[in-house]
A protein has these predicted regions:
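Positively charged n-region of N-terminal signal peptides that target proteins for export
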Residues: 1-4
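Compact alpha-helical subdomains of small soluble proteins
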Residues: 22, 63-160
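Cleaved targeting-peptide boundary
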Residues: 19-25
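N-terminal signal peptide c-region/cleavage motif recognized by signal peptidases
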Residues: 14-17
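Early exported N-terminus immediately downstream of N-terminal targeting peptides
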Residues: 30-73
Length: 160
């Protein structure tokens, strides 16, 4: 009986050690925020491109240029999240990342569906215009700023 208890205890501890926590590291939380921001900008650019003010660059084109200019930064954020999904045992980390992006885009699409297009675009369009002038450090600072209305989908390890 004592042997069985020892084996079961050892097994329990080994399973605990093998199980990766599902909470985010700080870097993973920042990466999620960055991917959420990027997904929202895409949706804004697509939904509001027809309302681009006269004489200004098409909003979706501005979004695409912003993406190209900062592709390395967003690729690094994606790699961080792929690492999270691998660490937590996702069968297909890339599919998990794509699902996350889709869920973020769907949320802003639902917000846009609840508003008249002119009101939605009037409210969100300035984001595209603002990011077109941002440098990498500005984007990193934005992604590192957590807002109560936009919590991460998972808790950050060690935070309550």
């Amino acid at each position: 009986m004592k042997f069985l208890l020892t084996v079961l205890t050892a097994l329990a501890f080994s399973q605990t050690a093998l199980a990766a926590p599902s909470c985010y590291t700080q870097a993973e939380a920042v990466a999620e925020q960055a991917i959420r921001i990027h997904s929202e900008l895409m949706d804004i650019g697509l939904n509001c491109q027809h309302m681009t003010p006269s004489g200004q660059k098409n909003l979706y084109q501005s979004y695409r240029e912003f993406t190209a200019q900062h592709s390395g930064l967003f690729a690094a954020y994606e790699n961080t999240l792929l690492g999270y999904f691998q660490r937590t045992g996702a069968k297909n980390p890339e599919a998990a990342l794509n699902t996350m992006r889709t869920e973020f885009a769907n949320k802003i699409s639902l917000d846009s569906a609840k508003m008249r297009p002119d009101l939605f675009c009037g409210h969100y369009m300035p984001r595209i215009q603002r990011v077109s002038t941002m440098g990498q450090s500005d984007i990193q600072k934005w992604a590192s700023t957590f807002f109560p209305g936009h919590p991460t989908t998972r808790p950050v390890c060690g935070q309550k």
